[in-house]
Amino acid sequence: MQFMLILSEDPELVATDEQRKEAVQRVGEYAMSLLGDGTLKGGSPLHPVTEAKRIRTRDGQRRVLDGPFAESKEVIAGYFLIEAPDIDAAVAIAARCPNAEFGSVEVREIVPMG
């Protein structure tokens, strides 16, 4: 089974250059460990939310909103696509992710298409 780990971070917990550097290093090491044991199937960090766009269409009218988006304290920082036998195993893998300490990690099963 495949799962997406949606990595969020609280900007207040990675506010300094030193905190950000440490976070990037720790997440990189975590990713390498998943790659090494064959668990990691894909993933990537994302550009900052300040560069994001959100599109909403209501009643045929499209609006494009510029980030950051005030309704959320945590921001999505990246994702991993992993292989695991079941949701419990995926949660155990996600629990080791450093983002759980300075944000959160959401685990979602991928729905096979086709």
Q: Could you say what each language-model-derived stretch is?
A:
Residues 1-114:
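Conserved, structured core segments of small domains
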